[in-house]
Amino acid sequence: MGLEAVLTRRSDRGGVAMELAVTIPTLILVLLAVLEVVVIARTQLELVAAAREGARVAATVADPARAVTAVENALAPVLSDRVRVTVTRPAVVGRAATVVVSLRHRMVTPLLRWLEVDLRGRAVMRVER
């Protein structure tokens, strides 16, 4: 092994550590961003499913309070305390009953706890009775 090879090898010693020092935090940030997107998507799907359940009840029962109860029962306990439910049900059969479930979602990641996103699920069904 020549002198030139030894000098080249010594100058590359901290390269891998430096690359890891830059790459690992970047990967962690990307993983946290993916986690946030998944949590938001899951919450959005839950809101839509709960609104659909509330609209089913609103389409068959004249009492809006029963539709609100159906929405709260369809949601996870963590979400049911924080949602706002709006039920619009006309008295005329054949018209559309609308249920809107909304929530201000706070991010899960500690670095983004200050950030909130408005999520909303909406369902419309024809009044049957």
Segments predicted by a language model, with ranges:
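Short, conserved structural patches
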Residues: G2-E4, T60, P64-R129
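Alpha-helical assembly-interface signal, strongest on the long, hydrophobic N-terminal helix that forms
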Residues: M1-A70
